[in-house]
């Protein structure tokens, strides 16, 4: 055990010794290496020392910049919330605008401007300011959009205040922006509130909307811009009134164009009332345009009235052309007069008058009175006093046109009847024609009498009541008292207007019977040639008298006379042709004298030219007549002949003339042909020494045996020139018809003439009127 230990120790010692030897060797090697390294380091340091110095300096500078960056980052972290708020200003401002938080948006805009003044070179601040400008434009657009909506006065003031705080616009520019925005709202409100409807509803809604909205806009404008300084130009006040003038002009144009489609008087009155209320409402802010509305409504009211009465007149005249007058039954004139007077008295006692019942007997007059009363009712609702004189003038023209149309119709009818009598050789046809015409005269005279005494006075009275009511209302408005107006205060002289009609139905023909030869038909011997400026003339008709002789006056040798002379006064003051009236009754000469006395001056004025013109024609046919006093007789001899009268009829006529004539009695079938001459009141002619109407009427010429021979020669000459005279009659009738049409363009009597020419041959009339009162024969 010990040996082992000894061996181990020896081994250990040997190892230690060996280790020591090795360590010594290693130490020597290390020392050598260290020496070598130190030498190398020393040599390297000495050679690389400048490089090391520069590197240190570089490191030092880098470390300094890093230190500064570190400090700035640390400062940024410390102020992160503030910087975040600045960066979020544009986004926050946009959010405020969208939420209508205009105060906060304006505060952010003001804060951004302050930052920009301090850090105008900062890139971040510049970018923020660019975004702020975009948001500001959005803010202005939003504020203007609010002004284009239905906004209250408070919000208007706030909105304009926001625009003022932006300091972008001047005061005048703000006014223009305000009015432009509110005008857009007004246009849109009118566009959407007023839908397609009838014209009255459209104007009513338009007027109400304009009245409310324009008044609000003007009130808002005055409230917002009332505190401005007076150093501004006075033209600033014109901004508002120019805008108002434009709006009123547009409104008036719309009213003017829309009223063309409104024909009801009550509707026009309703629109007028709303328009006047509109003007009166905005007059509280200094705007009153009622004077601009008056001519517009007056124009449309007058046009509607004229259109209605023109249509009524045209319808009446056209109806008159084709209307067949029923032959009148024998009625008591007293009862008709009583009914008319009672109706008129009852109507006068009532506030609302009714048409006379006599108008119902004539369909054209009944239709005409309905149309005219309709136009009066339309006019009554909206009748301005300023149109009174114009409407009176138009009403007078209407009455003249109606009277002229009826007179022209009558004249053409009788002219056509004369042509039929001349051209018809048949005794039966001539007798039938004259009998029908005689029956027709009674009906037509009743028609003219109703027109003159009932229809026209009733129309004038109705219009007088309308004028009186308007004048009373105007008087009450002016001084609070009502004034009563006298009857027919409108100044229309009814008597002068219906004078021509009265001459038609009040003319009484004087019939002088001829011989007892009843085998011959009543042939018109002499017919006056028509002249539109001729004086009252006479025609002759051989009739069948009673055998009672009467003394005859002795005429002068130079004056040829005719067997029968009848005369009547001119039926119309209007220009027309010479016509002939057929009458089967013996008329009273006194009434005829009265009618002639009324127009004596007019007849004398036109007598000279007629006599002079006809004298030349008479010289060609009758060499024995040279005096101007015989012109009427010569004219009659030239114009009324029968083309187909043979020698037998001529001899019978001469025999009839030799018989004594009685003016006291006449047979039932005697027919007197009466010439009614209508002188022209519009043509001026010099008056000469001619016989007055009274002298012609009072003188009923009787045939004289001395004159018979002259008449034979005259009749012979007349028969030779019958073709020429007949042509002259037709030519004169055409000239008269042309002149009538020029005076009344709406009247064309040609269809009437053609219808009447064809009618008499088809109508059978019993001459015994007393036994056939129930016949309902029409002409």
From Swiss-Prot:
Keyword field contains Translocase: no
Superkingdom, taxonomy of origin: Eukaryota
Region (Disordered): 1-36, 328-349, 512-691
Entry's transmembrane regions: none
Keywords: Golgi apparatus, Membrane, Protein transport, Transport
An example Gene Ontology biological process: protein transport
UniProt subcellular location: Golgi apparatus membrane
The keyword Lyase is assigned to this record: no
GO CC annotation: Golgi membrane; Golgi transport complex
Membrane topology, from the record: Peripheral membrane protein
Comp. bias (Low complexity): 8-36, 330-349, 533-543, 561-640, 675-690
Classification via InterPro entries: COG8, Cullin_repeat-like_dom_sf
Biased amino acid composition, Pro residues: 544-560
Broad class of where this protein is predominantly found: Golgi
Biased composition (Basic and acidic residues): 641-658
Subunit description: Component of the conserved oligomeric Golgi complex which is composed of eight different subunits and is required for normal Golgi morphology and localization.
Protein task: Required for normal Golgi function.
PANTHER family reported for this sequence: CONSERVED OLIGOMERIC GOLGI COMPLEX COMPONENT 8 (PTHR21311), CONSERVED OLIGOMERIC GOLGI COMPLEX SUBUNIT 8 (PTHR21311:SF0)
Family: Belongs to the COG8 family.
Descriptive protein name: Conserved oligomeric Golgi complex subunit 8
């Amino acid at each position: 055990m010990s040996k082992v230990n000894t061996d181990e120790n020896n081994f250990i010692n040997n190892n230690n010794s060996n280790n020591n030897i090795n360590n010594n060797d290693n130490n020597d090697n290390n020392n050598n290496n260290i020496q070598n390294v130190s030498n190398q380091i020393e040599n390297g340091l000495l050679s690389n020392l400048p490089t090391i110095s520069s590197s240190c300096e570089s490191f030092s500078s880098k470390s300094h910049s890093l230190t500064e960056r570190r400090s700035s980052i640390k400062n940024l972290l410390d102020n992160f919330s503030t910087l975040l708020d600045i960066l979020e200003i544009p986004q926050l401002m946009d959010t405020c605008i969208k939420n209508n938080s205009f105060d906060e948006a304006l505060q952010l805009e003001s804060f951004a401007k302050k930052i920009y003044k301090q850090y105008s070179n900062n890139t971040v601040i510049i970018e923020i300011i660019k975004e702020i400008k975009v948001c500001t434009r959005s803010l202005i657009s939003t504020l203007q959009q609010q002004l284009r909506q239905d906004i209250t006065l408070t919000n208007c003031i706030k909105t304009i205040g926001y625009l003022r705080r932006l300091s972008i616009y001047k005061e005048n520019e703000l006014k223009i922006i305000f009015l432009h925005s509110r005008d857009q709202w007004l246009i849109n409100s009118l566009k959407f509130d007023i839908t397609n409807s009838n014209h009255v509803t459209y104007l009513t809604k338009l007027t109400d909307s304009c009245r409310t909205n324009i008044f609000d806009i003007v009130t808002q404008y005055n409230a917002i811009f009332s505190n401005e300084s007076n150093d501004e130009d006075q033209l600033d006040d014109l901004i508002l009134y120019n805008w108002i003038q434009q709006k009123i002009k547009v409104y008036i144009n719309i009213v003017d164009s829309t009223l063309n489609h409104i024909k009801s008087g009550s509707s026009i009155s309703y629109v007028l009332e709303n328009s006047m209320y509109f003007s009166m409402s905005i007059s509280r802010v200094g705007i009153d345009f009622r004077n601009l509305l008056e001519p517009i409504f007056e124009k449309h009211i007058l046009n509607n009235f004229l259109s209605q009465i023109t249509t009524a007149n045209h319808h009446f005249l056209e109806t008159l052309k084709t209307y067949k007058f029923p032959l009148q039954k024998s009625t008591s004139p007293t009862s008709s007069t009583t009914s008319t007077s009672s109706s008129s008295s009852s109507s006068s006692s009532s506030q609302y008058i009714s048409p006379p019942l006599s108008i119902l007997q004539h369909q054209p007059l009944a239709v005409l009175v309905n149309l005219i009363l309709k136009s009066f009712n339309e006019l009554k609702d909206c009748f301005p006093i300023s149109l009174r004189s114009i409407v009176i003038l138009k009403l007078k023209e209407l009455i003249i046109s109606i009277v002229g149309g009826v007179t022209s119709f009558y004249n053409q009818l009788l002219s056509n009847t004369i042509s039929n009598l001349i051209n018809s050789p048949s005794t039966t046809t001539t007798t039938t024609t004259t009998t029908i015409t005689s029956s027709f005269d009674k009906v037509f005279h009743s028609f003219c009498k109703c027109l003159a005494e009932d229809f026209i006075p009733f129309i004038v009275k109705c219009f007088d009541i309308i004028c009186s009511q308007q004048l009373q209302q105007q008087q009450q408005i002016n001084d609070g008292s009502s004034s009563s107006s006298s009857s027919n205060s409108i100044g229309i002289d009814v008597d002068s207007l219906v004078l021509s009609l009265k001459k038609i139905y009040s003319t009484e023909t004087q019939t002088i019977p001829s011989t007892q030869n009843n085998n011959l038909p009543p042939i018109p011997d002499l017919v006056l040639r028509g002249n539109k400026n001729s004086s009252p003339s006479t025609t002759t008709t051989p009739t069948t008298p009673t055998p009672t002789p009467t003394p005859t006056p002795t005429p002068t040798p130079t004056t040829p006379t005719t067997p029968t002379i009848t005369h009547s006064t001119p039926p119309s003051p209007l220009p027309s042709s010479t016509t002939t009236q057929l009458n089967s009754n013996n008329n009273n000469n006194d009434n005829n004298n009265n009618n002639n006395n009324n127009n004596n001056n007019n007849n004398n004025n036109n007598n000279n030219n007629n006599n002079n013109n006809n004298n030349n024609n008479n010289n060609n046919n009758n060499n024995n007549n040279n005096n101007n006093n015989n012109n009427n007789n010569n004219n009659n001899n030239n114009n009324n002949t029968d083309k187909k009268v043979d020698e037998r009829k001529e001899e019978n006529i001469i025999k009839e003339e030799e018989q004594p004539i009685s003016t006291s009695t006449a047979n039932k079938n005697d027919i007197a042909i009466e010439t009614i001459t209508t002188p022209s009141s519009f043509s001026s002619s010099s008056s000469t020494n001619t016989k007055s109407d009274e002298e012609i009427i009072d003188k009923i010429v009787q045939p004289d045996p001395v004159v018979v021979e002259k008449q034979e020669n005259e009749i012979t000459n007349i028969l030779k020139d019958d073709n020429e005279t007949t042509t002259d009659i037709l030519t004169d009738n055409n000239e008269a018809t042309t002149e009538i049409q020029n005076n009344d363009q709406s009247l064309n009597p040609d269809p009437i003439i053609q219808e009447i020419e064809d009618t008499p041959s088809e109508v059978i009339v019993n001459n015994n009127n007393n036994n056939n009162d129930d016949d309902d024969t029409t002409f």
